Regions:
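ATP-dependent carboxylate-amine ligase
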Residues: 3-63, 492, 579, 678, ...
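Conserved N-proximal alpha/beta basic substrate-recognition cap immediately N-terminal to
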Residues: 99, 103-238, 242, 256
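Active-site nucleotide/adenylate-binding loops and adjacent lid/helix of ATP-dependent enzymes
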Residues: 186-352, 398
Length: 862
């Protein structure tokens, strides 16, 4: 078997609305020999966790489906072995023999992709040899763990993201530095670990300057250790005398995670060693008085005390039998311990500091300490070096709370970790000769959310409440538009209408990403990346997002839901691409847009398309319908129940809600309808008006938007762009499927002169679809020029042109039909041949180039 393609989805998708993170594998099972029972027995020897999922006896599935299911189960199991909680998966046969789509959940994208490849390797090996080498499986699991560590969010970030998700606040991971955006557009905030966009850079700089922090706190009357800073060991003895003599603490001026710190230094010899260790981290070294006591981390968020944890340095307790080395090994087997931030605790690693600390206690790694004796292994109590935490939130004295809150305000940190050394946190720090020894920006949350002893504290909630106070918005209005035809025009029209409200609108279309009036990126930008460009922009107040089939298939939706989901229609286009082989498959794919519409929002549906109407049964939002037929039974029933609709009634675009009716504008006064002749643009205008109205845009603002939106190369490039060229006209439209051709045919019928067509077709369409375009063209035009796209999409030259010609000749073998493969030459030839009062209709591949040719011709007339 072999993998043909691996895709990773990152949002609501064809396979699942709730499970956003999915791997989709297109798998060719090829020829295989299979004895199910023995294969399954061998598989369970390699992966015992699959033993309870005995599908070998299922008679309702073929051997091929069985193997595809096994690959899925292996991929899920591999991730489970390394602690990733994934359980969703499914398989689907394609129309091609023995080719399947295998779908399963992931937590870390690269781990999911690795699991897919490993699952195929394991399955193939068991098919061919009956086993899979243990060392290879262990290597796979090691690689997966490494990938997971590299790709997962840290525990502090994860806790904040989890709290945001619990409050239905959307989030986006920005770049590769664990920066997270919470909220969309103009309402966003950002965090990086426990730094936020509200964290002042001066406060962070001050907190990183340990000596400067201590000086400011001392000057403010805060109890801090006496200390000084030196750069050379020749000043060491003077510095020790200055702080009051031994015992002392030696630490780097700019350090973190306990690196380079030595505590309870009692001799000059020890001090020299400690100085060298500190200078490996920072050129400047702090010498300060050592306060005897326990290490406590007090967390202050937005000026308020949140939690306190006692931190205990990494240690082992003697059992009278085992060596310290063995005790460390036993301790590291605790399932709560992992590498780095992989788990709630970190494995203890022995380094030079550990050896020195053991030596000061009279031990080596081979020593066997007496039963019950605690042997410390680190100088500091950081969890990242193997320490443990004990929650003391309910024990701290009110005066210590007041002091910690004051310290956070003095330094200026919105999120501060304040280290207090005291024998008893329940007593005022001044009474027990304690001190504030450090103030930390970006404090870790793990010691509070998952203490080794005591009650876990939800310290992420105050962060979210600081960033988003009560009633503060986290989302901007999102309108998502999908369908086979009319998406781009409707998207642009909705965006234009929203601009009448005075808000900054970001929108994506098949011709580019726009914010306000500015083009951000040119191209076919209707996928999830383009949507996130808009949602990440801190100036955008409304997002209008064209959401096309291709992006949904490749990556899923780029956002978790919309306020309005619009489905224009579902027509037979792109069938056979991406294993979407039937129109029902296509409808299911496009329904993702409305199945994710928020319960408070609206699904705006085409009442004239049965496939679209059927989507109403699957949505959680309210439903609104649009129709060219004011007498539609569905519309009448819907508004009788108090529903919202838009219809074309007596020449007017009209909004209906229950017994209420409001005429927006007469269609002939809406420029995009070309005087009411472009029926499909009347329909597009209904959908746009309804979407805007559902979001409280006023009728007057909608009317103003409709009146100022023109089917031009500036506002709707490639969509019903009509040019006057002296004695004749030219029309440029990006119609590229049967439904699009039929819509243009309806417009042509109202044209008094002859119609000439310049036609082409995308090469990735089925032969029968291309032939149908030729057949339709034969009924539309009196003369036809056939051209080909520059990108043939896998076809040989002339194949598409010949299929189009075949379709034309099947309907009318006598129609003048000229093949000119180059698009520019074909357009020029058609323009040259145009008689008086005729209409040259161009269906371009390259819209801008086609418009440029016509504009150049027009400029010569003036």
């Amino acid at each position: 078997m072999k993998i043909l393609k691996i895709q990773t989805l990152r949002g609501p998708n064809y396979w699942s609305i709730q499970r956003h993170q999915l791997v989709v594998v297109r798998l060719d099972l090829e020829d295989f020999q299979l004895q199910r029972t023995s294969f399954y027995q061998n598989l369970c020897k390699v992966l015992p966790s699959l033993a309870g999922k005995d599908i070998a006896q299922r008679s309702d599935i073929s051997n091929a489906t069985f193997l595809a299911e096994i690959v899925k189960d292996i991929a899920i199991a591999l991730q489970g072995y390394i602690g990733m909680k994934v359980d969703f998966g499914t398989v689907k046969p394609t129309v091609e023999n023995n080719i399947y789509q295998v779908v399963f959940e992931y937590q870390t994208e690269q781990a999911g992709r690795y699991a897919a490849r490993a699952a195929v390797r394991i399955c193939t090996s068991i098919l061919e040899t009956g086993t899979y080498a243990t060392n290879e499986l262990q290597e796979d699991l090691k690689d997966l763990r490494d990938i997971r560590l590299d790709g997962q969010l840290g525990p502090s970030t994860e806790s904040i993201v989890a709290e945001a998700k619990a409050r239905n606040i959307p989030w986006i991971e920005l770049g590769s530095r664990a920066m997270i955006q919470l909220g969309y557009g103009v309402h966003q905030n950002r965090i990086q670990a426990t730094l936020s966009n509200k964290t002042g850079i001066l406060a962070v700089e001050l907190a990183c300057d340990k000596d400067g922090t201590k000086q400011i706190l001392r000057d403010s009357g805060v109890p801090v250790p006496r200390g000084t800073t030196i750069r050379s060991p020749k000043y060491l003895e003077d510095a020790i005398a200055e702080v009051g003599g031994f015992p002392i603490v030696i630490k780097p001026l700019n350090g973190n995670h306990g690196r380079g710190i030595t505590i309870d230094v009692r001799t000059v010899k020890e001090a020299l060693v400690a100085f060298d260790m500190a200078q490996e981290v920072s050129e400047e070294v702090i010498i300060e008085r050592f306060h005897l006591g326990r290490d406590h981390r007090i967390l202050v968020i937005n000026g308020k005390f949140v939690a306190v944890a006692e931190r205990v340095p990494a240690n082992v307790t003697g059992d009278g039998v085992s060596s310290i080395s063995q005790l460390i090994e036993i301790t590291n087997k605790d399932p709560r311990r992992g590498d780095g931030h992989d788990n709630v605790l970190t494995r203890i690693e022995i380094d030079r500091t550990s050896m020195d600390i053991l030596a000061r206690q009279g031990f080596t790694l081979e020593s066997v300490p007496p039963k019950g004796l605690v042997c410390y292994l680190k100088a500091t109590a950081n969890l990242s070096t193997g320490g443990v935490s004990v929650d003391r939130t309910d024990e701290i004295h009110p005066e210590n709370i007041w002091l910690a809150e004051r310290v956070a305000r003095i330094i200026g940190l919105d999120i501060a970790g304040i280290d207090m050394v005291t024998e008893d946190i329940s007593k005022p720090v001044r009474q027990v000769d304690g001190a504030i020894v450090e103030v930390n920006a970006a404090p870790g949350f793990r010691m509070h959310t998952a203490p080794s002893i005591g009650k876990p504290r939800n310290v992420a909630a105050p962060v979210i409440e600081m960033l988003f106070p009560p009633d503060a918005p986290t989302r901007i209005p999102i309108v998502a538009i999908t369908g086979t035809n009319g998406k781009t025009t409707t998207t642009r029209l909705i965006a234009h209408i929203f601009k009448q409200t005075g808000k900054r609108v970001g929108f994506t279309t098949t011709d580019g990403i726009y914010i306000g009036e500015c083009l951000v990126e040119k191209g076919d930008t209707t996928g999830p990346h383009s949507a996130q460009v808009i949602l990440r922009d801190p100036t955008v107040e409304v997002a209008v997002l064209e959401t096309a089939r291709g992006g949904l298939l490749r990556s899923g939706m780029g956002f978790d839901g919309s306020d309005v989901g619009v489905v224009m229609n579902v027509q037979a286009d792109h069938l056979g691409i991406g294993d979407i082989d039937t129109i029902d498959d296509l409808a299911r794919l496009k329904s993702v847009v409305v199945r994710t519409t928020l319960p408070t929002g609206y699904a705006v549906l085409n009442a004239e398309d049965p496939l679209v109407v059927a989507m109403a049964k699957e949505v959680e939002s309210k439903v609104a319908y649009f129709s060219m037929n004011p007498d539609s039974p569905l519309i009448k029933s819907h508004i009788a129940d108090g529903g919202l609709a838009a219809v074309y009634e007596e020449g007017y675009l009209t909004i209906l809600k229950g017994d209420w009716k409001m005429r927006i504008e007469e269609a002939v006064n809406v420029p995009v309808t070309l005087g009411g002749r472009a029926a499909f643009n009347i329909q597009n205008s209904l959908a746009a008006s309804l979407a805007a109205f559902s979001q409280h845009v006023t009728i007057e603002q909608i009317r103003q938007g409709l009146a100022t939106f023109v089917a031009s190369s500036e506002q709707t490039p490639g969509r019903m762009n009509l040019f006057e060229l002296g004695k004749f006209h030219a029309l440029v439209d990006y119609a590229h499927n049967p439904a699009g051709f039929k819509a243009i045919a309806d417009f042509i019928q109202k044209w008094e002169g002859e119609a000439i067509g310049v036609i082409g077709a995308p090469g990735d369409r089925r032969d029968e679809d291309i032939i149908e375009l030729g057949q339709l063209a034969a009924n539309m035009f009196g003369q036809i020029f056939i051209k080909e796209d520059k990108d043939l999409r896998g076809r040989a030259p002339r194949v598409v042109a010949d299929l189009l010609r075949q379709g034309v000749q099947e309907i009318n073998p006598n129609i003048p039909c000229i093949t000119i493969l180059d698009e520019a030459e074909a357009i020029s030839a058609a323009l040259d041949s145009a008689p008086q009062s005729s209409l040259v209709v161009v269906f371009p591949d390259k819209v801008d180039a086609a418009i440029a040719i016509i504009e150049a011709r027009k400029s010569k007339l003036s």
